A protein has these predicted regions:
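Soluble "head" domains of membrane/secretory-pathway proteins
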Residues: 2-126
Length: 126
């Protein structure tokens, strides 16, 4: 997802029917009628917090070298810390500033996801 997926890029994803998403998987989901591509950062049973140090999963500050923006809470978003319920995942956009993700809408039910991204084909320069 970095650099960000842009209009015209082709996203190829596997229609995942399993419940085996793992942290760092990039998935496709639908939110308010819009397709989103988001990274799974926590799965069922994980505790998620966002502190002054950044993203914290199960008490450990996450090292995210591929993320160039600090992960921050949204003022009108979900309350932290939170524990991801069974059958759900917590997702974040790689472009953290202004991303609509689990900080806004909470955990995502796996049954509401469309699949796991396999590759992105950049078509902007074709």
């Amino acid at each position: 997802m970095a650099p960000a997926i842009k209009d015209g890029d082709l996203v190829i994803f596997y229609r995942y029917t399993s419940t085996d998403y793992l942290p760092q998987d990039v998935i496709v989901l639908e939110y308010e009628g819009q397709l989103q591509v988001r990274r799974v950062v926590a799965t069922a049973g994980d505790t998620v917090d966002i502190t002054g140090e950044g993203l914290v999963i199960n008490g450990a500050v996450q090292q995210e070298p591929e993320i160039f923006q600090k992960t921050e809470r949204y003022q009108n978003g979900v309350s932290f810390p939170l524990t991801v319920p069974e059958g759900q995942v917590f997702v974040l956009g790689d472009s953290r500033i202004g991303a609509t993700d689990s900080r806004i809408y909470g955990c995502v039910k796996i049954e509401d996801t469309l699949g796991k991204v396999m590759t992105v084909i950049r078509r902007r320069s074709i």
